[in-house]
């Protein structure tokens, strides 16, 4: 597999999580609860953290939300969850961070949108006020530019300058440039006010895939700040998953991006953790990181008129997901395990041999038996109506025998 060479950046510490080129690409998420409702926000943070989110962002939009942040962080710590909590500020962050110092101290990072803090205007020092609090508390900051809330004064100025050119650029290109200028100018001002380069993360979010790729390629060439990747609004369902994957994977393959968020729109009362799982799957599918054993299963065709292989694949995948909270604390490297559940003789044996453990179920008109391969070799052949239970037992034994010794060595047993 080709090596991905990460773009060189400083490393930013966010709580106990490191983000930058010398650290793994970090998965983050954001709550959609009212932060002032501390109990509901704690509940959602627990779900996101247990799903694997390594950073969690919460909205801090009013006094009650700011008052709730310390209780949120303390409540999570009491149950053993120390995932860094990031405060998302718009319009009034300079007021809230000054007014509620306990909130400023409890948060692990502040997100500032330069498009709505009037940065650069002579009569407005809101941005400086927020940076001053970050410097005082030694907190990192993400300067997050969004095309939907871009500094209109800056954009208008650049549009006017463009209109005077002999060959004006397209409006889309001017907007992309304005986003980059906003991010870089804001970062330079933040450094003048006392933030170090290893305390600054930049993002320039749009909602179109090609726009995302273009703006981050250009931004990456023009600075060495840590970069946060993501579409500002990916959308719902398959559209959101595909758009995020298409955009992020191109940039990640080029070594661009140090932390990612997949901004999926959940269904009403839907599961917020889906965005975490999709982000993890993007990284794992690209062999950038490993989070959980991967189950390979064929899509099925006319040779597989039975649904049994589909049912087995689903049951094994669900079983692995259920076991992972225990497995990852006991077994070193289990997240890299590959399991194959195949439906006929065409690709079944070959795919199973390439996996750590695989089973090739019989297709239509094939002999009713299922060979099981372990580390490329035929181990046994299963028959009858206990295939699920027997294969699960083999899987458990493989995990225990293959990965337990590493865990014992790691703890010095």
From Swiss-Prot:
Q: Which Pfam families match?
A: GcpE
Q: Which InterPro entries does the record match to this protein?
A: Dihydropteroate_synth-like_sf, IspG_bac, IspG_bac-typ, NO2/SO3_Rdtase_4Fe4S_sf
GO biological process: what's one of them?
terpenoid biosynthetic process
What Gene Ontology molecular-function terms does this entry list? 4 iron, 4 sulfur cluster binding; 4-hydroxy-3-methylbut-2-en-1-yl diphosphate synthase activity (ferredoxin); 4-hydroxy-3-methylbut-2-enyl-diphosphate synthase activity (flavodoxin); iron ion binding
The pathway where this protein functions is: Isoprenoid biosynthesis; isopentenyl diphosphate biosynthesis via DXP pathway; isopentenyl diphosphate from 1-deoxy-D-xylulose 5-phosphate: step 5/6
Disulphide-bridged cysteine pairs:
none
* Chain residues that bind [4Fe-4S] cluster: 298, 301, 344, 351
Keywords from UniProt, A to Z, are:
4Fe-4S, Iron, Iron-sulfur, Isoprene biosynthesis, Metal-binding, Oxidoreductase
Superkingdom of origin: Bacteria
Task: Tell me which cofactor or cofactors this protein depends on.
Answer: [4Fe-4S] cluster
Q: How many cofactor units bind, and how?
A: Binds 1 [4Fe-4S] cluster.
Question: Does Aminoacyl-tRNA synthetase appear among the keywords?
Answer: no
What SUPFAM superfamilies has UniProt attached to this entry?
Nitrite and sulphite reductase 4Fe-4S domain-like
Metal-binding as a keyword of this entry, yes or no, is: yes
Which reaction(s) are listed as its catalytic activity? Answer: (2E)-4-hydroxy-3-methylbut-2-enyl diphosphate + oxidized [flavodoxin] + H2O + 2 H(+) = 2-C-methyl-D-erythritol 2,4-cyclic diphosphate + reduced [flavodoxin]
Q: According to the UniProt entry, what is the EC number of this protein?
A: 1.17.7.3
Q: Which family does it belong to?
A: Belongs to the IspG family.
Please explain the role this protein plays, according to its UniProt record.
Converts 2C-methyl-D-erythritol 2,4-cyclodiphosphate (ME-2,4cPP) into 1-hydroxy-2-methyl-2-(E)-butenyl 4-diphosphate.
Q: What is this protein called?
A: 4-hydroxy-3-methylbut-2-en-1-yl diphosphate synthase (flavodoxin)
Its source organism is: Koribacter versatilis (strain Ellin345)
């Amino acid at each position: 597999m080709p090596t991905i060479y990460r773009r060189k950046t400083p490393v930013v510490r966010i709580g106990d999580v490191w983000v930058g080129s010398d650290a793994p690409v970090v998965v983050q998420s954001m709550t959609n609860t009212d932060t002032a409702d501390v109990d509901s926000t704690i509940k959602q943070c627990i779900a996101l953290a247990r799903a694997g989110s390594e950073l969690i962002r919460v909205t801090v939009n009013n006094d009650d939300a700011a008052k709730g942040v310390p209780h949120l962080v303390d409540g999570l710590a009491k149950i053993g969850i120390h995932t860094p909590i990031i405060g998302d500020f718009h319009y009034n962050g300079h007021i809230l961070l000054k007014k509620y110092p306990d909130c400023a101290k409890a948060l692990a990072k502040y997100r500032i949108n330069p498009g709505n803090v009037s940065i650069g205007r002579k009569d407005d020092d809101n941005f400086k006020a927020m940076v001053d609090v970050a410097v005082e508390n030694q907190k990192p900051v993400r300067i997050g530019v969004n095309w939907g809330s871009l500094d209109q004064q800056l954009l208008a100025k650049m549009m006017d300058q463009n209109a005077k050119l002999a060959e004006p650029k397209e409006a889309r290109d001017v907007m992309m440039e304005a986003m980059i200028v906003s991010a870089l100018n804001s970062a330079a001002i933040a450094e003048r006010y006392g933030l170090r380069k290893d305390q600054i993360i930049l993002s320039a979010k749009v909602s179109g895939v090609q726009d995302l790729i273009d703006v981050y390629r250009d931004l990456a060439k023009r600075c060495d700040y840590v970069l946060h990747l993501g579409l500002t609004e990916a959308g719902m369902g398959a559209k959101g998953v595909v758009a995020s994957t298409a955009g992020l994977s191109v940039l990640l393959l080029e070594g661009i991006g140090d932390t990612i968020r997949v901004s999926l729109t959940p269904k009403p009362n839907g599961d917020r953790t889906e965005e975490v799982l999709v982000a993890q799957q993007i990284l794992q599918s690209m062999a950038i990181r490993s989070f959980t054993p991967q189950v390979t299963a064929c899509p099925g065709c006319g040779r597989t008129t039975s649904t049994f292989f589909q049912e087995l694949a689903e049951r094994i995948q669900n079983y692995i997901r259920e076991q992972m909270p225990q497995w990852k604390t006991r077994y070193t490297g289990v997240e890299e395990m590959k399991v194959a559940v195949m439906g006929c003789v065409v690709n079944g044996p070959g795919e199973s041999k390439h996996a750590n453990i695989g089973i090739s179920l019989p297709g239509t008109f094939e002999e009713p038996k299922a060979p099981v391969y372990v580390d490329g070799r035929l181990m046994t052949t299963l028959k009858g109506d206990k295939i699920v239970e027997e294969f699960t037992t083999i899987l458990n034994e493989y995990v225990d025998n293959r990965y337990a010794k590493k865990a014992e060595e790691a703890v010095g047993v």
